[in-house]
Amino acid sequence: MVKVLGLVAILLIVLAGNVLSYDRQGTRKNLVIHPTNEDDPTFPDQVHISLVGPDKMRISWITQSSISPSVVYGTVSGKYEGSANGTSSSYHYLLIYRSGQINDVVIGPLKPNTVYYYKCGGPSSTQEFSFRTPPSKFPIKFAVSGDLGTSEWSKSTLEHVSKWDYDVFILPGDLSYANMYQPLWDTFGRLVQPLASQRPWMVTHGNHELEKIPILHSNPFTAYNKRWRMPFEESGSSSNLYYSFNVYGVHIIMLGSYTDFEPGSEQYQWLENNLKKIDRKTTPWVVAVVHAPWYNSNEAHQGEKESVEMKESMETLLYKARVDLVFAGHVHAYERFSRVYQDKFDKCGPVYINIGDGGNLEGLATKYRDPNPEISLFREASFGHGQLVVENATHARWEWHRNDDDVSVEKDSVWLTSLLADSSCKI
């Protein structure tokens, strides 16, 4: 049956026009990860957590049979003074796949910088997990990596990230690379569970989450929206495809490259209102995240609508709001730009960083444009991850760590000053 599903998926990819037009190198094989306990259909599988408002956490997991979605939690292992109930759902994809029961439970209020122990499904569950909430003071530490996938390189990246004591993981789109072959979503959930069950993972979608097939499956983002529910309602958004959240001192805006972004569209109006509501006294740093990069000197993905037209539509909004950083994925390489606005250096513009280098099966985008544009300060086609440490209201440090023969090597680093600290860039 698995072979049949694989052949169907390959055929559908071709029919959908999802054929790459440039060479990829440095691939490693994809992983297949089975459930930890296949004998127990109620055993929690693919556990991950995400932030919900200032003091709550969403616990998400999958079971193979129907259960009452509930979570018990507490600050001492084995002692659970808190409990909460949630919702469950599932989905079909074509006629050949049905997901397990996807459970979502929001717990809280929670204390900052505190370890909580929890069980999915109630106190009788045999598996205990734990997570730590983000702190309520600086420094704040973000791990960043996009285009992750389920390859051996993906596993290597996650192993490097796990050795760093970060607070929140940010993924700028292209999660599982299921490409319509739904069992890869399950493998992805199991691959990231050791990290995603311990720290909040905040994600946005990419082109590989679309999974739309004319006539056969007309509803895009089915798996993504069901499996990775983000706090969109809490930020006034009407769609799981774009939202915002706060971690102490930092406002983060997760934008949708593959949904409406034209002036006057719902996302545009939401972004406009969201930016107006930012209190720079309490959140002096503002970070935006997209999938398709607005600046890119790699040969890959040049001239795509989602990059060019979204930039034309929204760049000025971010510039006028003095957004400090913009992360993107899509291009399977690393690149850091200077502060930019309208294709030129501008000290009041955001720093743009492309980090679609998580390790997916497609490999690396190794061809760069020559000569190197002046605004591109560092570029390298290697897998890896980034570390953003917001030290205080005015300064942050960015590091990019390359996966080098399975050893994490720091290759690029820079100190950043908040635009709020520059008197000439005052809003």
From Swiss-Prot:
Q: In which tissues is it expressed?
A: Expressed flowers and siliques.
InterPro entries registered for this protein in UniProt: Calcineurin-like_PHP_ApaH (IPR004843), Metallo-depent_PP-like (IPR029052), MPP_PAP (IPR041792), PPA-like (IPR039331), Purple_acid_Pase-like_N (IPR008963), Purple_acid_Pase_N (IPR015914), Purple_acid_PPase_C_dom (IPR025733)
Q: Which residues are glycosylated?
A: N85, N392
Its name, as the record gives it, is Probable purple acid phosphatase 20
Protein origin, superkingdom: Eukaryota
Q: Which reaction does it catalyse?
A: a phosphate monoester + H2O = an alcohol + phosphate
Task: Read off the lineage from the record.
Answer: Eukaryota, Viridiplantae, Streptophyta, Embryophyta, Tracheophyta
Query: What's this protein's family per the entry?
Result: Belongs to the metallophosphoesterase superfamily. Purple acid phosphatase family.
**Which residues are noted in the entry as substrate-binding?**
N207, H330, V331, H332
Q: Which gene encodes it?
A: PAP20
